[in-house]
Amino acid sequence: MKTVTFKIILGIMAFVIICSAKSSTRDPLALYAELDKNATPNTLTSKEKEKGWQLLFDGKKSDGWHGYNLKGFPDCWTIEDESFTMVTTGGQESQDIITNSVYRNFAFSVDYKLTKGANSGIIFQIAEDPKYKFPYETGPEFQVIDHTNWPDKLEDVQTNGANYAMYPPMAKPYKPLGEWNHLFLVVDGNYVTQILNDVIVVRYEKNSEEWKKLKDSGKWVNFPDWGKFDEGHISLQNHGTKVWYRNIKLKVL
C-alpha cells in the first residue's frame, strides 16, 4: 500500500512539474498574432488594448524615454516623420536611449528602417548604473544593421537579426533599404524569441549550458555583468548612423 501511495505521489509531482514548465512560457507566435499590422503607426487598436498592449511612443513626444545614465532626453536623438531617429555622429557610438520603466517578462514590437551602412540594435535587461558606459555591457542585443554595406567584415553572430555575439539568425527575411522592417522580441523567463518580418530568426534559453558556453568563449567574457540581470530597461542603440524607429509597443507577460 505504501508503495502504491508513493507512486501516486510521484505521479502527481511529475504532472505538476510538467504543467508548470508548460505554463511558464507563452507561444511567441500567438503573441505576435495579437498585433494588427494594418493599424495606423504609433497607435493601439481596441483589440490590442484589450490584450494588454501598451504604446511606448506616440510619434510626437519622447515621454517614457531618457538617455542612458542621463536625467533627460539626449540632443543626439530627435523625432522625425513620427519616428525616433539619430543625429548622426560619423559612425561612432553615442548616447543610447532607454525606457524609463524596467521589464522582466514581456513582448516588444517595433518597426525600423535602415539607411546604407546603418548600425543599431534593441538591447534589453539593461542595468542603468554610472559604472557602465553603454547598455550593451549588461544587456543582450537584437542586432539591427545593414551588414551588406558595413565597412568591416562581420561574423554571422553580428549580422542583422542576430542575438549579437551569441546566436546567428536562422533566416534572413530582410526588407530592402528604405523599407520598414518589423522586429518582435519575446522574453519569457529564460526563454527568448526574436522574430523579424514574420519569421523566427533566433530562439535560445538563457542560462542553459549552451548559452553559458557561448558567453564564456566570446565577446562577453570580458563583460562580467553581461546577461546577469533578468529585469531591466530596453534600449534603442545609437551607433552614430541613421535608423528610424516607430510603432513601439510592449506587453507585460
Model-derived segments and spans:
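Carbohydrate-interacting regions of secretory-pathway proteins
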Residues: 22-253
